[in-house]
């Protein structure tokens, strides 16, 4: 195709390359535990999920798994891609939840929330991490509602 006829807005290569270049241009890092949500534009997470799905299908093929005839693995690539982007690494691709604080009305003791279930992944081996967390704070000038602890823990995990 004549280069002059190409649409200038169509990105070259996979969406992951476009996002990666955007982050590199900003001078920020994108390590496994970093939140990169500010660099993902509307509609790109869906494209990234499709890309991961294609690569997951290739991985299953390389593992010599018959995803066409084995009913257990039909559509597994789609399910795994969705799980990795929306759940396991969800805090990487979504902004931190909004946390509203309120004036402390003189409460001086520690208050806690837990157990809060944690499902995460080790950034070194991609091994599942499953457990519970308890969060406790001694309030100062401001306090937050107990439900916010769950949101923060789930985002960070």
At which residue positions do the language-model features occur?
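Active-site loop/lid in soluble adenylation, ligation, and acyl-transfer enzymes
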Residues: 2-132
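Histidine-centered catalytic/metal-coordination loop motif
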Residues: 66, 121-157
